[in-house]
Amino acid sequence: MAVGHVIQVMGPVIDVRFEHGQLPALNNALTLDIERGEGNTTKLTLEVALHLGDDAVRTIAMSSTDGVQRGAQVTDTGAPISVPVGDATLGRVFNVLGEKIDLEPELDGTVRRDPIHRQAPKFEELSTKVEILETGIKVVDLLAPYIKGGKIGLFGGAGVGKTVLIQELINNIAQEHGGISVFAGVGERTREGNDLFHEMSDSGVIKKTAMVFGQMNEPPGARMRVALSGLTMAEYFRDEQGQDVLLFIDNIFRFTQAGSEVSALLGRMPSAVGYQPTLATEMGQLQERITSTNVGSVTSIQAVFVPADDYTDPAPATAFAHLDATTNLERKLTEMGIYPAVDPLASTSRALTPAVVGEEHYEVARQVQATLQKYRELQDIIAILGMDELSDEDKKTVSRARRIQFFLSQNFHVAEQFTGQKGSYVPVKQTVQDFKAILEGKYDHIPEDAFRLVGGIEAVLEQAKGMGVEV
């Protein structure tokens, strides 16, 4: 094993010089021991990012560099960072290096470990079949359906409900689907990760889930690589066991943000809005590995933070290009008390075609969107002149659009403690029939408020009865 020594420390970036001819390869993991006094030491892992010349390398630290001194001895492990894979990881919580961070015993030394850097599957190995993944969430299943083995993005600014939606999807899909899930917490709140772990333990889903965290308080190196650690675990289940795996990533923006934090320290010239010039390449390397092959599939659901609600920001804009379906969360809808605050006109899916979802579903979805679009166009007239100035046809459109808008909201299982209402799972067939009935005017006599935060149309009629309306 080659041994070098530290020549410079710049926050999370450390330069190391090796003997001539012993330079470690890019992406290799290096280790060094930090003295903590009283004979205690902690191990720090570095990843080689650049070759500087003069037998020196520039590395990114995976944990805090406090206490690192120039001249400290560094050892090349001769291989990239590797994480445990296989059934032993299920029900467990790991960090970016594959070290356990739960209260369970250490993993057996015989557990297989795979490197986190690898090539994406070859073009001819990719699967092309398109099949719908039912989520039980009306607005998603009707207007922007998810694809099994596809990539799905949940876009939204701060506090519009991305994490709650991802938790509901874990609850619905992981329990209904019964397969294996991997959750990668990338640069998000530790509290949310803790809550999620306990919720999954209570529901029993944890037994089929591996969790990897590199949270907000950790250095950029960990946040930059933890998505790859989670993906490596998912790839094993796909490639070696032929499973259909669910990969949840919360939040993909933090992966980009971590790259941008170290980019300047690595000596790269900043690009648009100060992001790293390698933004598209880094995103591509991650996203191209999240795919379905002829052996098994990885369905990924990724939360994407939108800085200042600006969708033209390079980070969310780069992620858009890789996705099969997008669910856009809109702040205006949260202000109206519509949860999940999914924008029915901005959300998209390449599966919303008659060939995939069927003629009836497609027609109902397009009619719902057309009604909501017409309502949006009429809102300016209503704001200036009031409802009375509209034609009878337009009044009917507005009345139905408002019912549709409220009916697109839904009570979530994971939000029971906030709403006091039981969560609901609505099958796709029922969703299509319910919206078809609203479009046909069968429920024009039911008050708008009865449509808020409910599951199926039966729950609407129940609420209406409670309001004293003849159903």
Swiss-Prot record:
Q: Name one GO molecular function term.
A: ATP hydrolysis activity
Q: Which domain of life is it from?
A: Bacteria
Q: Name one Pfam family in it.
A: ATP-synt_ab_N
Q: Where does ATP bind?
A: 156-163
Q: How does it sit in the membrane?
A: Peripheral membrane protein
PROSITE patterns cross-referenced by the UniProt entry: ATPASE_ALPHA_BETA
**Cellular compartments annotated:** Cell membrane
The enzyme's main class, written as a single word, is: translocase
| Reaction catalysis annotation | ATP + H2O + 4 H(+)(in) = ADP + phosphate + 5 H(+)(out)
E.C. number: 7.1.2.2
Which SUPFAM superfamilies does this chain map to? Answer: C-terminal domain of alpha and beta subunits of F1 ATP synthase, N-terminal domain of alpha and beta subunits of F1 ATP synthase, P-loop containing nucleoside triphosphate hydrolases
Its Gene Ontology cellular component terms are:
plasma membrane; proton-transporting ATP synthase complex
Keywords, ordered alphabetically: ATP synthesis, ATP-binding, Cell membrane, CF(1), Hydrogen ion transport, Ion transport, Membrane, Nucleotide-binding, Translocase, Transport
State the protein's purpose.
Produces ATP from ADP in the presence of a proton gradient across the membrane. The catalytic sites are hosted primarily by the beta subunits.
Q: Which NCBIfam families match?
A: atpD
Share what the entry says about its subunit structure, partners included.
Answer: F-type ATPases have 2 components, CF(1) - the catalytic core - and CF(0) - the membrane proton channel. CF(1) has five subunits: alpha(3), beta(3), gamma(1), delta(1), epsilon(1). CF(0) has three main subunits: a(1), b(2) and c(9-12). The alpha and beta chains form an alternating ring which encloses part of the gamma chain. CF(1) is attached to CF(0) by a central stalk formed by the gamma and epsilon chains, while a peripheral stalk is formed by the delta and b chains.
Provide the family line. Belongs to the ATPase alpha/beta chains family.
Under what name is this protein listed? ATP synthase subunit beta
Supply the source organism for this entry: Macrococcus caseolyticus (strain JCSC5402)
Its taxonomic placement starts with: Bacteria, Bacillati, Bacillota, Bacilli, Bacillales
**Gene name linked to the record:** atpD
